[in-house]
Amino acid sequence: MARKAAGRYASALLAAIALAGCMGVPGATDPAPAHQRAQAVLSKWAGAVAAAGANAAVTPIGELTGQVGDWEEAVGDNNKRALMAGMVASATALSEEAPQDGEVTWQDGTTTKVPLLAAQQAIVAIENTTEAPCSDCSMLMVTDARLTSGPIQTTRGPATAPVWEFTVQDTAVKLTRVAIANPVVVAPDEVGSGLGLSIDSASGSVSGTELTVAFVGAPDPGNMPCGEDYTAEAVESDLAVVVIVTRHPHVTIGACSAVGARRTATATLAAPLGDRVVLDLQQGTPVPVVLAP
């Protein structure tokens, strides 16, 4: 369920490595397009919230579909590609009646109730999340469903949430789908690095106006060869915050080592963070936020 989040980190690391290998001063963030992009991200998120019917109390991050166990050699190639293509169907009738509201629990003990998908609705949700078509794949046939719980990542950090677990014909692997009904989701975008660095997490507090974001950048500060300093600026709406990270590189003659490092920068908000989500400027998707007590 964390496949996309991991992909985001890997992409950011590759971008940082590419920048580190450039000669001279790498291109800095272009402020006007970055602000336009931030407004577009906020608008897209508002549309997703409206489409979901409400500003959900729980917003999952990353993949909602997953698996328990590894595919057996005999079926692995087909089943992996079939799942990515959303080629999943129920071999027997599954319940179309939604269970009672479930509970999401965060690591600090905070809980909230959420409406849940019926088992058949979860199958349909998997079918509708096609990453890559597969014309020569055989369908994955589900024979049973069990409502359980499992770890998920949310805009408020790691949590335990209701999850549907599906038995599949001819394999011991179980398919899973986060059971939360109508989550707010947006498809990731890909834009140029000239609009700012991609962030992968944030930290702050509900009542605070300081928001620290984490990303992959140069290992050294800007007063050292090949080093960079970073500043962060928040672009805000009632529903979300987008953080623009601006690079301030050291003027360097020659090539720099192709090494990226975890860096942070802090933005000042115009209003306390509250229950707003934090969105990545590059992909337009939410990142996990660690909230101080």
Language-model segments: which ranges?
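Short proline/glycine-enriched turn/loop motifs at strand-loop junctions of beta-rich domains
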Residues: A271-G274
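Long, terminal "pre-/pro-" and other extracytoplasmic accessory regions
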Residues: A2-T268, D280-P293
